[in-house]
Amino acid sequence: PTSFVNILLAASVEHTNIANNHYIDYGVSGRRSTRDTLQRAGIAYSGYTYTHIFEKDGVKIAFLGYTYATNVYWKTKAPRAGVYLPIIEDATVRRQIANARKLADFVVVSMHWGTEDSHTVNDEQRRLARLAADEGADVIIGTHPHVVQSVEWIEGKNGNKMLCYYSLGNSLSNQENIDNNIGYIACFDLVTDGNKKYVEAKPVV
């Protein structure tokens, strides 16, 4: 229900990624309702038709969001043709990260990917993480497996370093398995020092 947006407000959530496999479970009207509810609440989102740019103390951070698939196959028809589905496609990821780099100091990418209930990072996650690093993303925040996965630094083709959280696990869930009730919060600093810009990871306990 749309009233659940109040939970996000109570938790001081300022931004969310809406690209996930439930993105169009309730069709176009559900997607539109989600977007409108977030906008009315003043909560920014990515994973829709554009990259969200957040600015703090003169530093600009771009947020992008993608999902591996949606649960409902939906074919656009006039007059609704052109509705954007944020599926992970190599060309789209490359293009949007490149555009984001022109607009912002840092690029943070949400990836809804991986194998449910598996602590093991799969080959496709690693491939996509490498692609994002090569294109200049600074951080990946992964979701979907519902369990915790590893964190690592990935070096891009230009020598840049990208911090990748493959899966944060669950922060709130009705799943009963103990592994599904463990999650963590990604904590890192985006640092600007003169002409230098870099990411500093914080310990995750």
Which positions does each model-derived feature cover?
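Acidic, metal/ion-coordinating pockets
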Residues: 1-205
